[in-house]
C-alpha cells in the first residue's frame, strides 16, 4: 500500500525564452540582404493536472525541483525558434496549490483533468528582423529571451468525500467504514491503528453511492498538533457532513457525551467553519453494552440537541442498514438545500 503523504513543498520554474537571432539575407544576387533574424521560441510552462489515479503526494517527497524546457533560439531566414515543451505534473484530485512565500491559494484542483499553470515560460526574444526601421535598415542586435517564472509552491491534499467519520481513537471508525463500504482499512483494538485517512464507497444501489472518509482518531488538543488528528483535519473540510462516532461499550472509560463534546471543541478550535458542519451521531459497539437502557437516555439527549441518532454494532452488523439509509437521507437533504441556494 502506498504511503500517504498529504503536504509537500516543491520548486517550479518555467522554461527560458529562446534568444532572438541576428542574421541577414544572403542570396546570390543580393550580397547585402536585409535583416533576417527570427524570434526565439517561448519557454515551456509548468502545469499541474488533477487525476483520480493518484491518491498521495508521495512522489514529491523524492523529487522537489520541476523545470520546463527552454525555448530554442531564433534562426536565419526569419525562422522562429521552437517553443519549449510544457512540463505536465499529475497531482491527486483534491490538491490545493499555494504560494510558499505568501500563502496565497493559486488554485484548487477539485475535478478530473483540471489544469493550473504554476510557472509560466519566458517569452522568446525578438530577432533583428523586428528592429529594422527606415533609418536603421540593418540592425545588428536582437532581444534576449525572458526568464521563466520560478517559485516554491506548497501542495496540500484535501480528500474529496461526501461523509467524514470523526471520533476518538478506538471509537470503531475503521470497522464501521469496512461495514459500510468495501474499504479494507487496518483494524485493531487499540488507538491510532489508522495512521492515514481511508476512503470507501458505500453503495445502496446503482444510483445511490456515497464516498466516506475515515479520518484518523482525534484527541484533545489535536488543533495544537497533539496526536495524529491535526494532520488530517483538513480532509474533513470538503465533506458535506460528519458522522460522529462515539464508543458506548464502556461508559466508565469515557462518557460518550463528554467524548462528543471534546471532539467538537477540537473542530471549533481548528476551524469554526468545521464545527458548523452538519453532523449525525453514531453510537457504536452496542454489542458490548450490558445495559441497553443507557442508549435510550443517549438518544433522548442527542435528539433534543437536534442530532439524528443511530445505534449500531460495526462488529456484528446490527443497525448498519438503518445507518446506511440515514446517511443517504442526510446527504440528499444537504444536497437539495445547496441546490435551492444556488437557484
From Swiss-Prot:
Name of the protein in question: GTPase Obg
Organism: Aquifex aeolicus (strain VF5)
Annotated gene: obg
Annotated GO CC locations: cytoplasm
UniProt binding sites for Mg(2+): 174, 194
InterPro entries the UniProt entry points to: G_OBG, GTP-bd, GTP-bd_Obg/CgtA, GTP1_OBG_dom, GTP1_OBG_dom_sf, OBG_GTPase, P-loop_NTPase, Small_GTP-bd
Family: Belongs to the TRAFAC class OBG-HflX-like GTPase superfamily. OBG GTPase family.
Keywords from the named record: Cytoplasm, GTP-binding, Hydrolase, Magnesium, Metal-binding, Nucleotide-binding
Domain Obg: 2-160
Gene Ontology terms: biological process: ribosome biogenesis
Assembly: Monomer.
GO molecular function: GTP binding; GTPase activity; magnesium ion binding
Family matches, as Pfam families: GTP1_OBG, MMR_HSR1
Amino acid at each position: 500500500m502506498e504511503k500517504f503523504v498529504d503536504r509537500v513543498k516543491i520548486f517550479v520554474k518555467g522554461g527560458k525564452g529562446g534568444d532572438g537571432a541576428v542574421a541577414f539575407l544572403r542570396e546570390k544576387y543580393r550580397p547585402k540582404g536585409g535583416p533576417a533574424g527570427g524570434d526565439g521560441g517561448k519557454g515551456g510552462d509548468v502545469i499541474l493536472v488533477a487525476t483520480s489515479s493518484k491518491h498521495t503526494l508521495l512522489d514529491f517527497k523524492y523529487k522537489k525541483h520541476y523545470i520546463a524546457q527552454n525555448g530554442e533560439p531564433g534562426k536565419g531566414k526569419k525562422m522562429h525558434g521552437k517553443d519549449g515543451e510544457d512540463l505536465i505534473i499529475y497531482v491527486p484530485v483534491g490538491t490545493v496549490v499555494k504560494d510558499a512565500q505568501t500563502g496565497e491559494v493559486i488554485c484548487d484542483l477539485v475535478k478530473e483533468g483540471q489544469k493550473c499553470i504554476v510557472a509560466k515560460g519566458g517569452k522568446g526574444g525578438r530577432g533583428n528582423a523586428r528592429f529594422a526601421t527606415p533609418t536603421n535598415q540593418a540592425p545588428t542586435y536582437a532581444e534576449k529571451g525572458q526568464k521563466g517564472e520560478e517559485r516554491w509552491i506548497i501542495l496540500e491534499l484535501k480528500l474529496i468525500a461526501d461523509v467524514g467519520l470523526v471520533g476518538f481513537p478506538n471509537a470503531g471508525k475503521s470497522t464501521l467504514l469496512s461495514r459500510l463500504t468495501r474499504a479494507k482499512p487496518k483494524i485493531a483494538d487499540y488507538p491510532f491503528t489508522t495512521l492515514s485517512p481511508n476512503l470507501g464507497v458505500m453503495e445502496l444501489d446503482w444510483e445511490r453511492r456515497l464516498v466516506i472518509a475515515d479520518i484518523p482518531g482525534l484527541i484533545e488538543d489535536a488543533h495544537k498538533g497533539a496526536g495524529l488528528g491535526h494532520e488530517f483535519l483538513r480532509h474533513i473540510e470538503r465533506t458535506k457532513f460528519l458522522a460522529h462516532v462515539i464508543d458506548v461499550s464502556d461508559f466508565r472509560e469515557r462518557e460518550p457525551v463528554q467524548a462528543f463534546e471534546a471532539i467538537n471543541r477540537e473542530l471549533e478550535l481548528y476551524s469554526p467553519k468545521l464545527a458548523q458542519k452538519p453532523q449525525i451521531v453514531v453510537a457504536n459497539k452496542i454489542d458490548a453494552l450490558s445495559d441497553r437502557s443507557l442508549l435510550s437516555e443517549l438518544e433522548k439527549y442527542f435528539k433534543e440537541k437536534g442530532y439524528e441518532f443511530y445505534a449500531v454494532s460495526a462488529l456484528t452488523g446490527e443497525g448498519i442498514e438503518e445507518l446506511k439509509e440515514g446517511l443517504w437521507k442526510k446527504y440528499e437533504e444537504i444536497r437539495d438545500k445547496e441546490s435551492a441556494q444556488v437557484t
